[in-house]
């Protein structure tokens, strides 16, 4: 990870990593990614399930992994774009205290503009014949295929990271609390040819924050309210202003029960560690400028 040095002291924010630097712009821009993290427990052992959907010129891809809190991979299944014809399958692995199984069926999946399927699929993770995570709308097919008990279906959605694209307007959808409503997020920022660019963020068409004098405030954080919950918004647009035209800015929306606490914010820490300690849900957006 490479963090930009903060220019806001203790209240500053560091949310950029190597994937958001201009040096890796080509790699990030060439592929559209969405990664979701789910926290769960296997026999009292806290684990993280990661589901990554990708879309490139070669086609769709899917990666599912199960890690423990130390970062050790317990089980992983990869469906590469050039192997996506294998749209149905499973993978299992015996671990120290049980057996992890991953099932998927994408044979009838329908995709929209993004890398995630919108319907006609399922992805399931099973531990010792207990269904832990189930994604998709084909639930009956998943129940029949896995033959698993549903009592452990308790994985908590803790983080989402995605890549979004635009010229000056960038859009995404987000759900900030479990079973809460989806919200439309719009980030607007025009940095080309302007002496004093401005950043504005809207939620459900309502302006919730505006940053002027962006050349001096290219990194920062601000608290907004969504669904009555405090959501801390972090931004890093340094690469838009001072990097290459192909680089991306990073935005993070983080819910926290105790937002007044001063936390050592780091993009990788938030995405991978802090939510596992009960510090809320995180949405990380990599916003790429299109020419």
Describe the function of each predicted region.
Residues 6-90:
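Short Lys/Arg-enriched alpha/beta "domain-start" segment
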Residues 213:
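Extracellular glycan-recognition regions
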Residues 216:
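Short, contiguous, pocket-lining structural segments
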Residues 204-205, 227-228:
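Short strand-turn-strand beta-turns centered on an Asx-Gly dipeptide
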Residues 2-15, 80-199, 223, 229-291:
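Peripheral membrane interaction modules
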């Amino acid at each position: 990870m490479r963090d930009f040095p903060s220019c806001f002291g203790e209240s500053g924010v560091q949310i950029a990593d190597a994937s958001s630097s201009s040096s890796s712009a080509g790699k990030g821009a060439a592929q559209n990614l969405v990664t979701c993290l789910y926290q769960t427990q296997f026999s009292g052992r806290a684990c993280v399930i990661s589901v990554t959907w990708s879309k490139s010129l070669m086609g769709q891809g899917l990666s599912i992994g199960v890690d423990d809190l130390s970062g050790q991979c317990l089980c992983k299944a990869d469906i590469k774009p050039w192997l996506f014809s294998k749209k149905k399958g499973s993978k299992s692995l015996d671990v120290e205290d049980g057996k992890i199984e991953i099932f998927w069926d994408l044979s009838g999946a329908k995709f929209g503009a993004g890398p995630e399927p919108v319907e006609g699929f399922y992805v399931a993770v099973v531990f010792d014949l207990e269904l832990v995570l189930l994604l998709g709308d084909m639930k009956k097919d998943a129940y029949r295929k896995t033959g698993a008990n549903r009592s452990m279906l308790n994985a908590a959605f803790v983080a989402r990271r995605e890549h979004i694209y635009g010229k000056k307007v960038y859009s995404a959808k987000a759900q900030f609390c479990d079973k809460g409503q989806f919200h439309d997020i719009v980030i607007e920022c025009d940095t080309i040819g302007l002496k004093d660019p401005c950043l504005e963020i809207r939620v459900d068409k309502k302006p919730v924050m505006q940053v002027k004098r962006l050349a001096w405030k290219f990194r920062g954080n601000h608290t907004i309210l969504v669904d009555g919950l405090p959501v801390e918004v972090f931004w890093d647009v340094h690469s838009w202003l001072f990097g290459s035209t192909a680089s991306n800015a990073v935005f993070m929306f983080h819910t926290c029960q105790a937002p007044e606490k001063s936390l050592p914010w780091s993009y990788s820490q938030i995405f991978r560690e802090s939510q596992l300690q009960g510090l809320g849900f995180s949405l990380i957006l990599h916003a790429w400028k299109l020419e």
